[in-house]
């Protein structure tokens, strides 16, 4: 891909060597890169939608996101802090929202956390240290929270899995800014996800059933 952009390799050469599939993906990556260079404002939802339509093949966007995740993991040791900041800002306003749009929530969180690490270094490590210090008690609390919910859902005859997770560092930082408080002022540090194993025709009904059970317990 980089070789094509620099003129060291031709798309048609890739077509001959690897077939239409690979050539079309390369062509899509080049088109998206050209669009990116020509567009002055890329922080908007309109640009993200335009980029998705230009890509045509969704694999193009997946490669772009994967490439940015890889780059974000590697730039921590670069001496060029200005370039590091630019890459982190792009990850925050373009690639993380794209990952969210495609349902790649884990990658979205990783991109946001790494962006915060480079853009707001002190805030990132403050929150990380606080989370590490409270991990044991938080994990125990999550287990205590999940148990009665699991019992009620099982009594209702539902098939399900419950997962508890600590919210991302970026998410907590956003709450701290919005509420204008320190880490200790944020109480919703974790989230619970209930995943139903239900037939398609009963999905909606059982989702509402779970919602009703949980709200009855915690209203």
At which residue positions do the language-model features occur?
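Short, conserved catalytic/metal-binding micro-motifs enriched in Asp/Glu and His
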Residues: 1, 67
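Metal-dependent phosphohydrolase cores
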Residues: 2-55
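Nucleic-acid processing machinery
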Residues: 34-61, 68-219
């Amino acid at each position: 891909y980089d070789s094509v952009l620099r003129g060291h390799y031709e798309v048609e050469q890739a077509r001959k060597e690897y077939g239409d599939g690979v050539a079309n993906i390369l062509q899509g990556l080049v088109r998206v890169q050209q669009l990116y260079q020509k567009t002055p404002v890329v922080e908007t939802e309109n640009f993200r939608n335009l980029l998705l339509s230009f890509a045509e093949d969704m694999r193009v966007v997946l490669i772009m996101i994967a490439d940015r995740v890889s780059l974000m993991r590697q730039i921590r040791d670069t001496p060029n802090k200005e370039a590091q900041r630019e890459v982190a800002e792009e990850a925050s306003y373009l690639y993380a929202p794209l990952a969210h749009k495609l349902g790649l929530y884990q990658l979205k969180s990783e991109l946001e956390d790494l962006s915060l690490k480079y853009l707001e270094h002190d805030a990132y490590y403050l929150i990380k240290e606080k989370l590490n210090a409270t991990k044991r008690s938080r994990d125990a609390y999550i287990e205590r929270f999940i148990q009665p919910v699991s019992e009620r859902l099982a009594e209702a005859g539902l098939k399900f899995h419950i997962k508890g997770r600590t919210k991302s560092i970026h998410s907590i930082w956003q709450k701290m800014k919005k509420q204008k408080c320190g880490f200790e002022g944020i109480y919703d540090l974790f989230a619970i996800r209930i995943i139903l194993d239900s037939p398609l025709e009963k999905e909606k009904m059982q989702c509402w059933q779970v919602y009703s059970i949980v709200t009855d317990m915690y209203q």
